[in-house]
Structures are given as structure tokens and as C-alpha cells.
Regions:
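Hydrophobic, membrane-interfacing alpha helices
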Residues: 1-180
Length: 181
């Protein structure tokens, strides 16, 4: 059994912290963007171009996606996990540095961003989601590693040798389900 003791803060300058979770977002977005550009460039030369979006258009799309991830992820957390608190403390919603994002809110934000972008640029929603589905696992991978580092989203109690004791969940070992995904 392993006892989870990872610090979610990578760098602490006292007045400013850099957390593993923010690094996961940054890496996921940058590596996803680079991989998408590689896919787009390779299919531009192919007569079976399934992507039908240029690298310049994808660069513009990234701005929409980042906004969708951040706003959707935060609002998802606020609505699904702590609506009562945030309805009483409305100004706390914008304090992203205090934590609180949700995958399903981020996903909804991304879908809305793609809908807006596709209508504005007159590009098929499904052509955009084709490329997004290829690169999204990169971001999800880094996000789940950050969930493990944060000691959140742990699995059921387990007696397996690779189970992890997450102190925030009590003394019972649990599946490290974050890294299974």
C-alpha cells in the first residue's frame, strides 16, 4: 500500500503559487494544439482530408476552447458541487486560484465554444469535433494525473497491492482510479 503525500503545489513563492493542476491544463492545451496542427498538416496533403480545418482556423479555435474550458469548468464546479455556498458568496466564483473545476462543466464549455466557433466561421461542428476527439485525450491524461497529485477523485476501497491511502478519504486504501482513466 502507498500513502498519498504529494503536494499539489509545485512552486510556492509565498505570495504566489504554481499548482500541478495549472501545469496540467497548460501542458494539455499546448500539446493538444501541437498534435492537432500535426494532424491538420498531414491531412492537408492527403486527398482524403477528413479534418477540413486549417492550422490558422485551429489556432483561432484554441482561444475559444480555452475560454470554454475555464468558464465551463468553473461554472460546472460551482453548480454541481457547491451551489449553495457560491449563491451566498457570489464574488468567490471568479477566484480560480482557490481551486474548483469540473470535467463535465469544462466539456460543456468546450461544446458551446465549438458551436459558437463553427457558426461564426461556417465550419461543420462535426468536422471540428473530429479533430478535437483526437487531441482531447492528451488534456484528459494530464488532468487525471493532476487529480491524483491533488488526492481527489479516488476510487473505491481496495485491498490490492497498488491501492493508495488518500488521507483526505480516511485510512482505507483505495483504487487510484484517476490514473486508470
Amino acid at each position: 500500500m502507498i500513502v498519498h503525500s504529494l503536494d499539489p503545489v509545485l512552486i510556492d513563492l509565498g505570495f504566489f503559487q504554481i499548482r500541478w493542476y495549472s501545469i496540467a491544463y497548460i501542458l494539455g492545451i499546448i500539446l493538444g494544439w501541437l498534435y492537432a496542427n500535426k494532424i491538420i498538416k498531414s491531412t492537408e496533403e492527403n486527398k482524403y482530408n477528413f479534418v477540413q480545418i486549417s492550422t490558422q482556423q485551429f489556432d483561432s479555435l484554441i482561444v475559444y476552447l480555452v475560454i470554454g474550458i475555464i468558464i465551463g469548468g468553473r461554472l460546472g464546479y460551482v453548480i454541481f458541487y457547491n451551489l449553495e455556498y457560491y449563491s451566498q458568496n457570489f464574488s468567490e466564483i471568479i477566484k480560480l486560484w482557490q481551486g474548483g473545476m469540473s470535467f463535465h462543466g469544462g466539456l460543456l464549455g468546450v461544446v458551446i465554444s465549438i458551436i459558437i466557433f463553427s457558426k461564426k466561421r461556417k465550419i461543420s461542428f462535426f468536422k471540428i469535433t473530429d479533430i478535437i476527439s483526437c487531441v482531447a485525450p492528451i488534456g484528459i491524461f494530464f488532468g487525471r494525473i493532476a487529480n491524483f497529485i491533488n488526492g481527489e477523485l479516488y476510487g473505491k476501497i481496495s485491498s490490492l497491492s497498488w491501492s493508495v491511502i488518500f488521507p483526505s478519504a480516511g485510512n482505507s486504501p483505495r483504487h487510484p482510479s484517476q490514473i486508470y482513466e
